[in-house]
Swiss-Prot record:
Resulting phenotype, residue 131 to L: Complete loss of activity
InterPro entries for this protein: HemC (IPR000860), Porphobilin_deaminase_cofac_BS (IPR022419), Porphobilin_deaminase_N (IPR022417), Porphobilinogen_deaminase_C (IPR022418), Porphobilinogen_deaminase_C_sf (IPR036803)
Family: Belongs to the HMBS family.
Organism this protein belongs to: Escherichia coli (strain K12)
Record's catalysed reaction(s): 4 porphobilinogen + H2O = hydroxymethylbilane + 4 NH4(+)
Subunit (UniProt): Monomer.
Protein name, per record: Porphobilinogen deaminase
Pathway(s) the chain acts in: Porphyrin-containing compound metabolism; protoporphyrin-IX biosynthesis; coproporphyrinogen-III from 5-aminolevulinate: step 2/4
Effect seen on changing residue 132 to L: Complete loss of activity
PANTHER family registered for this protein in UniProt: PORPHOBILINOGEN DEAMINASE
Textual note on the cofactor: Binds 1 dipyrromethane group covalently.
Function summary: Tetrapolymerization of the monopyrrole PBG into the hydroxymethylbilane pre-uroporphyrinogen in several discrete steps.
């Protein structure tokens, strides 16, 4: 690698490329003279589109090929949507930077209805996320929830073709792609608690690459990093993956972190909720203790059922 060149491994979806260009522009603004190249790749998650993520290995399908490129020194950094980043990293790799967060809420998107509550009974709602399905089913058990895979454009096309009455997407993705006008309503966390890290962009690199880590330091957003740290600590303690509905959302209000979380049965029949408030420096411990509260309040049984008896201790 030339000293003035930095290579970004990225997926080729429009949203992934937006994120990669966002990081590229930030790096070049912070380090004049730096040459930043994109290394576009196809991941298994981009190829397997006919099966729900939970059944084919979860969100890690979107990052594995990028991590291999880092380990083989074909790229220097990988740019991820934080909600797709697994809790564990391959040896030698790690998350070193979290950029400023976009709006983390879920978006209600429909051509005929202004809100979730306006949908008639029997309406078909599309989402690929068990977390969203679970919360939808709890609030509106009279709706028909169907799986929806593909990139943002594909999902919107399926809505426009009449396959769904409404779909649920991330506000952040729609805003970044210039599609904010498609949002009929942003769902508050009380209705749809976001995914861990939703709306944030994370950067992974080789942990022994001190030059790259120095270049990335300017892009780290302290408040976002604190919030995502609390959310991910909760998820790590739960050993959360794609197979179980887990939501976690931290806000920084008046110098204090407010962390909310839930674990649910996939059909929405049971949702265990909890929250914590505390000092920012305690973000990680807050996440762990909230996870333990959820486990003790019934989440352990939900996880055991989903994972065939193999629940966190």
């Amino acid at each position: 690698m030339l000293d003035n060149v930095l290579r970004i491994a990225t997926r080729q979806s429009p949203l992934a490329l937006w994120q990669a260009h966002y990081v590229k522009d930030k790096l070049m603004a912070s380090h004049p003279g730096l040459v930043v190249e994109l290394v576009p790749m196809v991941t298994r998650g981009d190829v397997i589109l006919d099966t729900p993520l939970a059944k084919v290995g979860g969100k890690g399908l979107f990052v594995k090929e990028l991590e291999v490129a880092l380990l083989e020194n074909r790229a220097d950094i990988a740019v991820h949507s934080m909600k797709d980043v697994p809790v564990e990293f391959p040896q030698g790799l790690g998350l070193v930077t979290i950029c400023e967060r976009e709006d983390p809420r879920d978006a209600f998107v429909s051509n005929n209805y202004d809100s979730l509550d306006a949908l008639p009974a029997g309406s078909i709602v599309g989402t690929s996320s068990l977390r969203r399905q679970c919360q939808l089913a709890e609030r509106r058990p009279d709706l028909i929830i169907r799986s929806l895979r593909g990139n943002v454009g594909t999902r919107l096309s399926k809505l426009d073709n009449g396959e769904y009455d409404a779909i649920i997407l991330a506000v952040a993705g729609l805003k970044r792609l210039g599609l904010e006008s498609r949002i009929r309503a942003a769902l508050p966390p009380e209705i749809s608690l976001p995914a861990v890290g939703q709306g944030a962009v994370g950067i992974e690199c080789r942990l022994d690459d001190s030059r790259t880590r120095e270049l990335l330091a300017a892009l780290n957003h302290h408040e976002t990093a604190l919030r995502v740290t609390a959310e991910r600590a909760m998820n790590t303690r739960l050993e959360g993956g794609c197979q179980v509905p887990i939501g976690s959302y931290a806000e920084l209000i008046d110098g204090e972190i407010w962390l909310r979380a839930l674990v649910g049965a996939p059909d929405g029949s049971q949702i265990i909720r909890g929250e914590r408030r505390g000092a920012p420096q305690d973000a990680e411990q807050m996440g762990i203790s909230l996870a333990e509260e959820l486990l003790n309040n019934g989440a352990r049984e939900i996880l055991a059922e989903v994972y065939n008896g193999d629940a966190p201790a």
